[in-house]
Amino acid sequence: MIKVGLNLGNSKLSCIVTDYKNSDNINILSVLNYPSNLIKKNIIINYEKLLNEVKNLIIESEKQSQTKINSINVNISIVDSLSKYYQSEIFISDQQITDLHLKKAINQSEYFGENENNYELINDIIAYDLDKKIIHTDPIGNYANKIKLYFYKLLIDKKYLKNIFNLADDLKLNIDNLIPSPLSSALSTLSKDEKSLGTICIDLGHSTTSTAIIENNKFIFGDSFLVGSSNVTNDIARGVSTTLSSAERLKTLYGSIISSPSDEHEIIEIPFISGENDKFTQINRSTINSIIKPRIEETLEIIWQNIKQNNLHNKKIKNVVITGGGSQLEGIEEYARMIFSSNVRIGKPLEFLNLKDNFYNPSYSDIIGTTFFEKD
């Protein structure tokens, strides 16, 4: 089965074409990235230009994969989304649980409630309570006096989605699934055990940072905010008065969150912000790292506070996977361990995939994960 994923990001457009057998057998036929700056904060700057860029991306993907693209999974940014938890309970007088009991509990819940301004990107049962015993598998066949269902709902603005649907219509493409971007990243980077036992997956992207929490193979929390690796680049450019391209180079080659005594003595030559070829100044490596560290600290603290606000810190999840381009900053694993008091690793696309070496890179986690998504 051919599965196609499309990502409309703030800095790039991406398309992946796969021959999908199952989650353990995926052959990647094509992965393409086009630089683009036509989407900012979930707002399309120029619809016609974006339409043309996506059209060219699809055409080139068809050529590379030798496949006709008719339908797509779309990665959806969840900036300004709303996470909501709700529950429903019924009494069944120690009967054996049937499908009808579950349907009754669902029907009397908020599951089918309409929302005028928001679209339900995720609306799922995440746990069952049978007489105060929590289970995460289908309860049918068990006996109970009282059944309680716990739900998780992720809502996003309908206006943003309307543009996505219009884009697909104009390109004559069907949308199979809309996938929260952090969930895509988690699906491509987490092992089976990590998804079962509970893991916080953090994607440090170009313009956004996104979080997904997976536990008992369920997506139980998603969040995203407008701080990314480009903010680190901007901080460096302002902090040392250099060009953005020079700041990006400094971040990539010398950036670290963990300081070393030798940083004071490592001197780096950088151009002035004017960009004149013959005008340079010198800084030491510790200056760069003193700029990077507060931004990363702030970003990780925001994630942790958002998790606490949703009372998910009580789950005491001890696994954190950091992916996305920003995850390649030296020292981020060690620093995240201190923030989250957890095991931390850098997440790359899973190794069993048929990928060229350069795609086993955290920057590709979100687009590759779009083809892993399957509705229950």
Residue spans of the language-model regions?
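Glycine-rich phosphate-binding loops at beta-strand->alpha-helix junctions
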Residues: 258, 315-339
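Extended, charge-rich low-complexity interaction segments
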Residues: 65, 205-215, 365-376
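A conserved active-site cap/scaffold subdomain adjacent to cofactor or substrate pockets
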Residues: 226-247
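A short acidic Gly-Thr/Ser loop motif
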Residues: 6-12, 77, 201-208, 214-217, ...
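Residue-level signature of catalytic and energy-coupling elements of molecular machines
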Residues: 15, 74, 168, 203, ...
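Glycine-rich phosphate-binding/hydrolytic loop that grips phosphoryl groups
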Residues: 345-376
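Nucleotide/phosphate-binding catalytic cleft detector across ATP-hydrolyzing
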Residues: 1-12, 16-199, 218-220, 243-244, ...
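A short, acidic, amphipathic alpha-helical segment used as a generic capping/interface helix at domain edges
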Residues: 298-309
